[in-house]
């Protein structure tokens, strides 16, 4: 809806030229990645052996079924499901003998979303917008491991689980949602200067971050405390706050050829991350043997002190190092329990980009050249310690080095304060760049 509230709210105030209230509410559903459904076809529980049915070298051994892999039929994808019976077997290990299924009642992810906004235009030409958005999950994705069985309980209350061959079911959860508040202002001045500024604050929760295509990876690479008791927690993709400021100046230094200088500054809080156990034995805490859970994705129990009965430190020096790390950082508030998923934040990030453009006359009427110069990440250009993004890989920091003991306690072997903290620069986002070019307009 849109409602002109100029007279209702500001009829007796000359400083407000117009006021509009707008909003809406409804159920929204986006596109569904087909790979979610594809898992049930690629891992049907049949007698196929992925290693045996194809290969670039027909002499390569098939480690699951014996014999050789056999040549891949060139240009014929049907061999995946119509191969000769000799290419099928019951694997000797369960790795590819799993069945991944889709709940017959599965519904595509959908949310109830609503927003309410107030747009103002002042007598001075300022445009102001205040907006609130609310998102409540109706159906989201949840994965279940159908063979999961709790075998015992550890000292902090989490279960220890065994499982079958890894049979995963794609189903739904109703948990999750988001709230966002934003404010923006923009103004153009008569002297060629214009400006824009905005601030936003977001609180978002989800259950599975869904960063992987395969069901076992989406399931396993989710930080958890107790089996499939995975409540909605802070989303790995949210930024608590973000500030954007833009300035632009236009003038004509010679003739009717425009000179434009633009700058945009961004400051945003870092993405959330979890602190987990670093499982030195490569056996996930909370799982037994070959587990559906992934190593190093068990949320860490935080000892109360060096004498905590739920843990065993391998030495006095290890106890001192670990407790110093806990007491002098954000883990201190979680002593005696575990730190929830995504309870911590990566470092904030600042960035400044500048663009300069200049029109240049051509020899033909109506034709012009446009020269442009981009200065990207100016803060890093001025100081190589600025303008850099540091994040924990997969939103996980494996800081407490530990293994599970047979009596349910945790054997703590050390601490790694910045495990998995990386400089993110795959796309050049943490380095300065200069680029220039020339366009011809006609």
Where are the regions a protein language model picked out?
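Solvent-exposed loop/turn elements at secondary-structure boundaries
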Residues: 2-169, 289-292, 347
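Short loop/turn motifs that connect adjacent beta-strands in outer-membrane beta-barrel proteins
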Residues: 4-19, 124-125, 190-192, 252-261, ...
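Transmembrane beta-strands of outer-membrane beta-barrel pores
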Residues: 3, 25-31, 134-138, 201-205, ...
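Hydrophobic, lipid-facing positions within transmembrane beta-strands of outer-membrane proteins
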Residues: 1, 19-21, 102, 112-116, ...
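Gram-negative outer-membrane beta-barrel transporters
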Residues: 129-274
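Extracytoplasmic gating/loop element in the C-terminal half of outer-membrane beta-barrel translocons
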Residues: 86, 260-363, 370, 395-422
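Residue-level signature of outer-membrane beta-barrel architecture
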Residues: 1-5, 27, 120, 187, ...
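Membrane-embedded beta-strand positions of outer-membrane beta-barrel proteins
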Residues: 21-23, 118, 130, 185, ...
